[in-house]
Amino acid sequence: MTLPDFRLIRLLPLASLVLTACTLPVHKEPGKSPDSPQWRQHQQEVRNLNQYQTRGAFAYISDDQKVYARFFWQQTGQDRYRLLLTNPLGSTELELNAQPGNVQLVDNKGQRYTADDAEEMIGKLTGMPIPLNSLRQWILGLPGDATDYKLDDQYRLSEVNYRQDGKNWKVVYGGYDSKTQPAMPANMELSDGSQRIKLKMDNWIVK
């Protein structure tokens, strides 16, 4: 089915208690230079990952809607990935499978949609303008196309500022999972005006 011009998917409302669990700590440590060899090495180690997956909590907050879901993100190859959103009851709300030139999405009614742009599809079906193309890099702790960013005292990404399609996205990282090598983001928050997207990763599996 081709993509409609109206919203179809409605996830469960966001409980107020969930917001406090995703609150990011304020970092006061001095940052490191983006030109440092340690940062270049960390970027290269992350880019060398062929496959990875993570799961955790997702929150979207705007003036129009508040949404909470569990998410599962799996990358199986270059530009091949799967995104699954489930509600607090464990039911699937959205499943997206993407590969070069072909994106398929199944909603909570089992209806299947196809398109060639995952970011546009998510926005039209859910009403949430998630910068999915950039988020694929940001969730790994990489700046993507952004040139305005800061590092923490461990030479890892701590903040990104990026203008895209008239939106000014700010990404703040609240910590990293040092149990994985290389260390991967543990939680992060994206904001543009009154819109906020929060991700809290429970664990990572990297290869």
UniProtKB/Swiss-Prot annotation:
A lipid is attached at C22 (S-diacylglycerol cysteine). Residues 1-21 form the signal peptide. One of its GO terms (cellular component) is cell outer membrane. GO terms for biological process: lipoprotein localization to outer membrane; protein transport. It is found in: Cell outer membrane. It is a lipid-anchor. The keyword Chaperone applies. Keywords: Cell outer membrane, Chaperone, Lipoprotein, Membrane, Palmitate, Protein transport, Signal, Transport. InterPro entries: LolA/LolB/LppX, OM_lipoprot_LolB. The keyword Transmembrane does not apply. A lipid is attached at C22 (N-palmitoyl cysteine). Pfam families: LolB (PF03550). Monomer. Belongs to the LolB family. Plays a critical role in the incorporation of lipoproteins in the outer membrane after they are released by the LolA protein. This is Outer-membrane lipoprotein LolB. It comes from Salmonella arizonae (strain ATCC BAA-731 / CDC346-86 / RSK2980). The gene is lolB.
